[in-house]
Structures are given as structure tokens and as C-alpha cells.
Amino acid sequence: MLDSNVKQLLNEQVNKEFYSAYLYLDFSNFYKSKGLDGFANWYNVQAQEERDHALLFVQYLQNNNVRVTLDAIAKPNVPMDTLMD
């Protein structure tokens, strides 16, 4: 049985991993819109890696009979208007 603090921290990490994936996907969309397909692809790969991390934590928690709580994913607050941003 997992300690309640460990459960909470792991659940928080699941949500952080999904937020990171969301952020990388936002970067990918930005670079794609600028015609920089290589950068867009790199950020897509990073987004997938973050989703994979989240799912590993989910699986671990589920295997330990812990119900995962998925929070809303916040909109990334990173201004990206130019390549210099």
C-alpha cells in the first residue's frame, strides 16, 4: 500500500507531465506555423515523451489500486509571436 503523501505527489506528477506535453504541443504548433517543420517535429516528439511519462505514472498508481485524479490542463502562458520569443 502506498503512503498517502506518495499517492498525492505521484498524482500531481501525472498532471504536471500532461501539462508539459500540452506546452510542447503548443511550441510545436508555433514552429509549424512558421514553416519550421524540423522544430515542430522535435517538439511533437517531446510532447509524446511527456504523455508516455504521465501514462507510466497512471499505470503505476492503477496497479497499486489508486484512482488517478486528472485536473484540467491549463493553457500555456508563453508568449510566442516571433522566433525571438
Residue ranges, per PLM feature:
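Iron-associated oxidoreductase/ferritin-like identity signal
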Residues: 1-85
